[in-house]
Amino acid sequence: MSKEKLDRINELSKLAKTVGLTKKQAMEQKALRNEYLSAFRSSFTDHLHTVKVVDAKGNDVTPQKLKDSKAQKHKRLH
C-alpha cells in the first residue's frame, strides 16, 4: 500500500475523531481500511509460510495446518 494511501487513512481517522466524517469520507475510509487489511493479511500469511517450527531436539513440529497451507500455496504457484 502506498504512503499516500496510508497518510489518507490517518488523515481520515483524525477527522473522524475531531469534526466527524461526511458520508463520502466514511465510505472512502472504509474502502481504504479494507484495502490495508487485505494487504496486511496477505503479507502476514506470506511471512508465516517462511516459518518452520522445531523443538529442542531439532524435530520439525510445525503445525499441520501451516504445513497444509504452505502446500496449497505451492500448488497454486506451479
Swiss-Prot record:
Keywords: Cytoplasm
Cytoplasm found in the keyword field: yes
Keyword Plastid belongs to the record: no
Primary location group: cytoplasm
Annotated InterPro entries: DUF896
Compartments in which it is found: Cytoplasm
GO cellular component, one term: cytoplasm
UniProt region (Disordered), positions on chain: 56-78
Pfam families, sorted: DUF896
Family per similarity comment: Belongs to the UPF0291 family.
Record's protein name: UPF0291 protein ABC2165
